């Protein structure tokens, strides 16, 4: 679908795709894997060796890989959109207090979510309005120089997983 929008986007247009903080939780991929996820036509993605059942460890890995692919595909697509005078970016939110997140907080994984929030630098989850504010920046004239970028807005959760108390 992203490619189709790229075919019709008007000069001066902008787009935002929601990815996820989870894509940042995936370990490093090779340059070849990044390029494959970014550039393979959408209808051929399931043929990539890296997404074959024997390569996908579990459902979390599959989810993280799909979110990483979202951000990489937008980055690659930004090159094409730029030729039309348009921009496209991703936002990768962490725990945002939507109705779904509130359900997850009270479900079986609730303790894990509460621990992540407690140990992330911001000490709280985000709000839909905060995501909307970043989206408005990216879509509006103040974001005119921003394209092909992924905005990680997770209250520092990824930092805590890499360098803080949530690090392995």
What are these regions (language model features)?
Residues 16-18, 88-91, 101, 148, ...:
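Hydrophobic structural elements of the Rossmann-like NAD(P)H-binding subdomain
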Residues 28-29, 101-106, 162-164:
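Conserved catalytic-core motifs of eukaryotic protein kinase domains, centered on the activation segment
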Residues 7, 11-84, 95-98:
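Catalytic loop of short-chain dehydrogenase/reductase
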Residues 32-36, 107-109, 167-168:
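Glycine-rich, phosphate-binding/catalytic loops in enzymes
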Residues 86, 95-103, 107-122:
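SDR active-site lid
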Residues 5, 55, 62-63, 68-71, ...:
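C-terminal helical subdomain
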Residues 147-168:
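Short C-terminal tail/terminal secondary-structure segment
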